[in-house]
Amino acid sequence: MAPVAITPATLVGHDLKSSRASERATELSPVTLLDIFSRAVSLYPKHELSFVTSSAHDSSVQTRSFSEFDQYARALAWAMLAWGKPTGSVIVVYFTEHEDNMAAVWACLLAGHVPCLQPALSEQQAHKEGHVAHIKNLFSSATWLTNESGAEQVHSITGLDIRLLSELKARAETVGADFHAHQPNPDDEAILFLTSGSTGFSKVVVHTHRTILAACNAKGQSYGLTSESKTMNWVGFDHVAGSLEMHIAPLLYGASQLHVHVSAILADPSRFLRLIEEKSIQLAFAPNFLLAKLTRDLEKCSDLFGKFDLSSIKRINSGGEAVVSSTAQAFARTLKNFAKDGNASFVISAGFGTTETCAGCIYDPIDVLFTPPSYEFLELGTPLTGCEMCIVNPQDGVTPRPDGESGELQVRGPMVFVRYYNDPKATTSSFIEGVWYRTGDVGIIEKGKMRLNGRIKDTVIVHGVSYGIAELETYLQTVEGVTHSFLAAAPHRDPGQETEGFVIFYSPTFELDSEDAPAKLYATHRALRDVSVKMITLPPQQIIPIPLNQMEKTTLGKLSRVCLVNLFKQGELANHIARAEELLSIARGATFIAPSTETEKTLGRLYAEIFNLRVSDVSASDNFFELGGNSIDVIKLKREAESLFELPEILTVQILKHPVISSLAKYVDSLVSKDGSQEEYDPVVPLQLTSNKTPIFMVHPGIGEVLAYVDLAKYFQNERPFFALRVRGFEGQPLFTSMDEMASSYAAGAKRTQPHGPYAIAGYSYGGVVAFEVAKRLESMGDEVKFIGLVDIPPHIADRMHDWTSGMLNLSHLLGLMSKQDADNLAPSLRTLTRKEQFEVLWKLSPPERLTELQLTPEKHENWVYIAGGLSECGMTYQPGGSVSVLDVFYAMPPHDTKEDWLNQHLRRWADFCRSEPSFTNVPGHHDTLMDFDHVSGFQKIFRDALEARGL
């Protein structure tokens, strides 16, 4: 088999590349990663590694020089040697922040160990435990280096040796000149990476010092890196693009680097532009789905057009999935709008690569505005120096395809991995003739340039992450209405679609001409969508019911995804799709109410935009949260509606109370006409009203608001109503003056909403104590309270309450206006000022973009501070007393104590106030994060299990 002769990729349309790159590569000849590290420190000690963390709402950048980072990593390595692990031991490195991951990897290498970078673990407990057990068995043992949050996620798996970075730091000392780092050989294992596990449990990709060096040399030459270059990365460090492509490759050439947690950019898209300007960034990386999202979000910041100096940026690499040409062009146009130089040009370089190829190995950098792309997706171009590619017949894996004809893409070169760890069978099957790596992708090479045309493997890529079709199908098969073993899911991408999706084919258990077919089909499709969203965060593009007698299986009894997709693309399933739409239309028609007033129609268009629906499909009876609305969407709806209706403010709580279009329209009309009287205070805020199981009432945390519960409430759709209890005072009402007054008001609100028990009530943090008091009052009225959930709060809280200054700073921290450390450092100096002066200082220090995002004015912020202060004052005089029938206590990692001390010395005291034995349940995350986006899916499962265990 003869590979296609391709010249290495070169950089087009900019002056970043110079002869200095090749001269530097020649001058420096490291043969291991530690050579790269020590050479960079020696030649460029003052060059920088900078970081923006997930908690840096204030845009602060933390920086270490190469020299400082070297000392830090060596100190960690010195402490690591005390573990007594044999040289070559595998250490699983598990962090979310770039700096932690980076320091851990270099410390492992310096100490003679092999780091294995672990991506974020699944929130599905069974899958997570299965994965961790698989990794442990693969390595024969498992040492995990992580933080307290990571340790909490894996604590239930037996046999793990869990080491904390905080403990390693505590033992680390300044290392003297006599410290001798490990001296590896070029072919030793360097870093291990996990595949996505898209076809089962993850495989472990072994990269040696030699493969990584070959890749980084070639990447640096392609990118035109020099010691004067400055790069920015916002891909996770556990991904080869984040660690090899955007850290080790620039380090090889001595380039300064900025690593930004993706949440920091998504929270404030303009930060991407500011960082490019402030740090004079020349090279950046962003996958296709982030390019698309960044474009959409930045387009809303038109007031910043022409405000940024973006002249430094020379190239933006993109990969992870096919890059839509229109997306790349829209992104480049958006950057041009923001640039001070109206003639600025931007090179977007789509790339192909896998974990097995050290990320990108084929590139096509072009100025997409100057050279319009020829195809729907950007071409992927030509391979890096040393890499070869070929297209072959996928049936035999050997016969070359002619130019312009699609087939299986294979690559070979020194940057290709050497093997899968402890998996010779998978290694052998991944190579042809021992050298050509089978990527599993279908591609076309035409006139020397490659472009992708599909995939052989059974995976779907959502936002750059691969998900296994087989595992998704396993869960979809459990849906009522699906005939067992007659369901298939297949990846699919419509023309112009920004990211890949999938289609579900299945045979229903009921006849499609039966009288109740519309209702049954609607319920089945809704359940299939719910499972899909919970499994892979994306609903299917199409669900196609096919009668059993028309769903053909192979001789081995399997459905052919390829055949089904081909039938779908060729229009052969159009009659089934039309029949399903007809039945679903009948089902929807039973409840569909066309928006009638202009306000309803405007809100209908807004709902359609937020949830990517056809305007004609939006009913006046549609509920914002049942459509999938989350806490971020609430803020978006609030902003857009205020703009469309030219209103100074629509209260967030009113959106929560009026999520149905017709109801919200009436409220908006009352604001527009200015004849709406202020509603009487009602603490009960309905977040979810579907189904008829016992409702859950959740009391607000210490800041008084209930937005923290919006994402949690979504998981109770079609199961039970979910009500939040919100404090008095946000609309100008008088504050509560005691815990008794507050609890009595909430108990009365719960009784108005649900006149009779049994009740289920819970509260997070401060709200847990209030929930306990509400439950006592309900029981004293003769009602049964079958569930009382207390989330991470002890019974005695008086000494935990903040004074006014600390309360104000704590609120600012929780709102993302400053870090916890900054809040603690600021407290002493603020206490010397009056309250008015303290607030003025705090307001000036708050990042404007975050204030805008929260739509906070000085008046609203000050009022919120007084509300939180009022709650704190109620807590200062509170002493628990009496008892309730049951208690379920949930606890996370505390800010200061160990989890064991937090449980045993504080939380277990709830036993003194319960007439039965309380249950104590561990939940993932820290106190401040246990209900955030990363943890809420895990928390809800534990919480719902507890409700069911109480017979609810």
Swiss-Prot record:
Annotated GO MF terms: transferase activity
Function in brief: Inactive atromentin synthetase homolog. Does not accept 4-hydroxyphenylpyruvate (4-HPP) as substrate. Both the adenylation (A) and the thioesterase (TE) domain of the invA6 enzyme are inactive.
Gene responsible for this protein: invA6
Residue numbers spanned by region Adenylation (A) domain: 58-462
Entry-linked PROSITE patterns: AMP_BINDING (PS00455), CARRIER (PS50075)
Family the UniProt entry places it in: Belongs to the ATP-dependent AMP-binding enzyme family.
Gene Ontology biological process terms from the UniProt entry: biosynthetic process
Native source organism of the sequence: Paxillus involutus
Keywords from the named record: Phosphopantetheine, Phosphoprotein, Transferase
Domain Carrier stretches: 594-672
Protein name: Inactive atromentin synthetase invA6
Transmembrane segments: none
UniProt-listed InterPro entries: AB_hydrolase_fold, ACP-like_sf, AMP-bd_C_sf, AMP-binding_CS, AMP-dep_synth/lig_dom, ANL_N_sf, ATP-dep_AMP-bd_enzyme, PKS_thioesterase
Residues that bear O-(pantetheine 4'-phosphoryl)serine: S631
Lineage of producing organism: Eukaryota, Fungi, Dikarya, Basidiomycota, Agaricomycotina
